[in-house]
Amino acid sequence: MRRSIACLALCLLCIMQPGAAREAAYGSIAPSRDGIGKTYMGREIAQVMGYPGADWLERGSREREERPELLLAALGLAPGMAVADVGAGTGYYAGRIAARIGDNGRVYAVDVQPQMLVLLEDSMRRRGVRNVQPVLGTATDTGLPPGAIDLALMVDVYHELSHPREILDSVARALKPGGRLVLVEYRAEDDRVPIKPLHKMSEAGIRREVEASGLVWQQTVTTLPWQHVVIFRRP
């Protein structure tokens, strides 16, 4: 019975106008301890980590916990690429990506917190990184140029987006045909991952939400200790 109701709901979403379908996918509940009380496709959206917690992004244990070199290897980076780091924070990954795509490549480091972009710019300046361009986005728009991006990356960001469908649409517009979106999220399927439940996502949940925006699942990489790397492409 539940499956029939779910299928009916999906069919209704498919025949609605795009704006109406987006609104229908959102809901509200009593906020949980780590959530905001807003839901998307039945999932409560997690609270955002603000810029006062930026030190956590640069914690000494992060390399051991996340193995960034394994993620970078999975991204298929090449010199000259245009890459968007959406929810870039302090630039932990933006700087590493910049080194791999070279001076002819560009990293668009997107964040909605101006204070976080100040920290990012300071970090890039200290490290002598010149091919990272800060972009101040909004809750509904990444601010990325249309059809210009080879690869968009979100590391532990998607589950906190207050308007996930609008951001997915914005990313899709920014991707070149065949361009890829990569979501990195802590695995909800694994109880041993020591992260709060709302800050983890299952592969099935990620795929359900992203595929609803029209992007096509390509593969899932499972080489990271605690996170899965779910890769989609623009048709």
Segments from the language model and where they lie:
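Core SAM-dependent methyltransferase catalytic element
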Residues: 217-219, 223-235
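Conserved class I S-adenosyl-L-methionine
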Residues: 180-207
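A short glycine-rich, Lys/Arg-flanked "PGG" loop and its adjoining helix->strand segment in the class I
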Residues: 98-99, 165-180
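Short glycine-dipeptide loop
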Residues: 79-80, 103-104, 175-181
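Hydrophobic beta-strand segment of the Class I
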Residues: 83, 152-153
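Class I SAM-dependent transferase core
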Residues: 22-84, 122
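Class I SAM-dependent methyltransferase SAM/SAH-binding core
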Residues: 84-142
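A short acidic, Gly/Pro-enriched loop at the edge of an enzyme's catalytic core
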Residues: 140-152
